[in-house]
Amino acid sequence: MGCIVGPNGKGGDALYFNFNQDGAPLFLVQVDPDTGEARQFNAPQGPGAWALIAGPDEKIYLGTWDGGLILRFDPRQPEKGIEVVGRPAASESYLWQYDVGKDGKLYACTYPQAKLVSFDPATGKMEDLGRMHPTEMYARSLAVGPNGKVYVGIGTEMGDLVVYDPATKQHRSIMPEKFRNTAPGNFVGVTRRSDGQIYVACHAGLLRVDDESVTRVESAPELPPLKLRDGREVTAFGRGSFSLRDPKKGKVAERTFKYSGAGDMIFVVGTGPGGTIYGSTALPLEVFRFDPRVGRSEHLGGMPGGEVYSILDHANQVYLCYYGGAVMNLYDPAKPLWKFGTGADCNPISFGGVGDGHLRPRAMIRGPGGLIYIGSEPPYGQLGGAMAVWDPQQNKTIENYRNLVTNQSIVSLAWEPKSGLIFGGSGNWGGGGTRPTEKEARFFAFDPQQKRKVFEAALAPGAGSYPATAAADGKVYTTVGDRLFTFDPQTMQLVRTNSLPGPQQQISLGRHRNGLLVGLTGRAVYVFDAMKGEVVHSAAAPAQILCGYALTDEAVYFGSGPRLWRYWLPRLEGSK
């Protein structure tokens, strides 16, 4: 998640690498910059930490997500490992970023109530300093200025710049009205640059802060480098590697180090060419492939997004669409090397975002005419996702429909060939930092010929989403909670409701080649026979099903934490 330079506990410097993982709590790796020798320290709590800093007491501090904890490591007493200091605000689950105040305290910004918290290493006192904005959820960045005041960047619906004065314990907005953006969907980013001054990045451009005066500037100094005491700088780092530049000699040394992880969280799985299984982990985004024919799994490589949200097998290649920005990428398994980029020689080749209103591309399906349809959740601070139509011949978006369901996200899609319609389900939420304005999710039909929505209804009043939709034998099937709905495209009527063995898992429902529907709930695999109108088979999973969905002739695959699971399907006959 990050790298800093900090004391090694013996009068010198060390590099500290912060790793999140899903199979166990996060860990910290202390690395000797001269040799690459590494020591690993596992945390007792917390899956990961965005915030990482060397404190004024020469200890290393981390701030976690999923708990909002302050963790501490003392390089002078490594035998104590990583300790839990505590939770400074009971309401907060994320500590995003730290900075050290002129008063010697650590300050951190939070989510989901956009608070500022502090910790005094000298006394051990933690303090909840309150909300920095009355309605926003994200206090995403902060920096302490030369005057000792703390500047906080707010988002995502109404970006703001707030200053907190430790001397008075008061805070207020200092964003000039002429620089405010009233449109939804914006962050204000705060940094302290190499000149020691505070700069702000926002929709209005680059701003400089002098005490509580804010002015626009054309440029700003660079961010302070990660610098060792002898002047060497960390110019690049990754998982198990780093580069050090010596400005005196003009040379760059590249080194590696070793660590042991318990596995990254699998975020999505999908079917690839020849019955292979593709998947993506989350934070970091790493793509893997499993070949059932030989029983071999391999790590293909990484991409710069957070995680792949949808996978589609197309013409012996694989489309991978990732968060953020719903960036579309095409991977060719026939080419031997993984080389991510935008050039013609890259594999996967990245084509950029699919369009306005797309951030998290949850649904991606084949549609009529060989086109691909992508449904997404909108960007941070915005309502109303979108559905894009992608042409694989040109590898670009040729149509895009924002707010196809007003103020809602598109979370599932299916093409029903007999009617020629694209059916889908929404989620009644918007992007991060927003609050739903619509009471219930909607089920809809889109006509590719007319290029418009031709049907919309709440099949389940009060439902928050329709997480999985599929088409088979002239009918459309969609889900809400632990219910499966059968919908007739000819009459546009709901014709049947069946109970499922638990709440439906997202994008995890499809037609097997034998005509039966195979789906996943959070705890079970189920098989639905449309001709009989009933669930004819279900099997409890030995682990919680956290993501799907790859269906082959013989099995269904899903992810649970860092592990890929397979369930061999029984021999059941349906309509071919």
Spans of features found by a protein language model:
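Short, conserved, GDST-rich strand-edge loop motifs in beta-rich repeat architectures
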Residues: 374-384, 424-440
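Conserved beta-propeller blade signature
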Residues: 14-18, 59-62, 105-108, 150-153, ...
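Repeated scaffold domains used in trafficking and secretory/extracellular systems
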Residues: 1-7, 47-53, 92-98, 136-143, ...
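Beta-strand-rich domains and repeat architectures in extracellular enzymes and scaffolds
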Residues: 1-26, 264-266
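A short loop-to-beta-strand structural motif that recurs across blades of beta-propeller domains
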Residues: 27-29, 69-71, 115-117, 160-162, ...
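Residue-level signature of beta-propeller blades and closely related beta-rich strand-turn architectures
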Residues: 21, 66, 112, 156, ...
